[in-house]
Amino acid sequence: VERVVRCVCSHAVTDYEYASGSLRVTGRSRISLVYISTSGCCLSAAFEERFTKNIDAPVTDAFAFAQVHACTDFTNYRLINQRKLEVRSGLQVHTEVFAYMEQSQLTDCCGAILRQADAQCLEVLDAGLFSCDFDEKFAVGQHNTNISVLIHTGAFAVIDEVRAIAGKMLVKCRAELCVVYENTEHNTEKCCFTVHSSKIVDVAGMTEDSHAFAQVKIGSLFVKPVPDENNDLRRLEIAGAFCVSYTAALVSDTQLVTDAYAIAYDARVQTGTVPLLRDPQFFYDGKTLSADLSFEDTEIAEILDLSLAMQEARVQNGLLLVEVGYGVAYYDVSGNLCCKDGVTRLQLALTDGKCAGFVGAGLQSFDYILQSA
């Protein structure tokens, strides 16, 4: 390795296990590397590492399920020598643990006066994680040339459909990929592909009237050139896996007793607090958001590829907060191949109230315009 052009690390949670008051989270870390070799060639490599994290969750035997999301906090690297690169990356793991809870209330009593209130509540049925694998081959080589070197691969994942059916949930995923490579004539070419995958998950209590929320990330991705029927390197094999986190919920009508009077009895009043997801609102819409990416110290001559990936989406105080990671591969004015990676944060107002909720947000498509300063 003579010079590192790009080193980026992304994380995805693949599974969790609860035991003895601790939530054990496991996942994959995907490292993508683009570098210049000592011979002046631009090369790329991809690596995968497994990670585990133990999180205290003292809910004892009442544990039901958990929502788990992971996003990249930072990635640093250090070139130790021409054959060894040290990569350090941090991730944030966001968890929400659900526990089974039983509450009793007085519903009817002779001689008692009850004050009752009707409430529409969101009952969480299940939350979890699963993976969808994909492995496809695509023909490339628009100018009848073979693939020489892969330079850069950009990809983002999309939830195409989430459908609730009796006792099950159908999730359809899609990945949009762009591969930049150099052919045998030393010309740089770019090709884009789409891969699909789907899975049916068992969810107890799920009906067609239920609501499902899902987010997807690319957990693993490997791209390599393979020979076609003429033994020419004009095909790409793309293999990997989607990591999907989901939440299933059902709207139910609940009757609550908020106060009671029993004058004819020697009664002791007991009150308590019950957490409820009341008066749910649902938003099914597509919005266009824009962000400015600044390259203050760089003059861009040509953009080879720009890739985006959803890092995190959550609802807080009536706002949809989104973090999107970006990667830009470009040539500077000196003809050097460069890359820039970062995270941009966007928000969208949903309601005027201070509400929270579950999110099934995804990136459908994007475009960009190169503007001069």
Residue ranges, per PLM feature:
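Viral structural modules
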Residues: 1-373
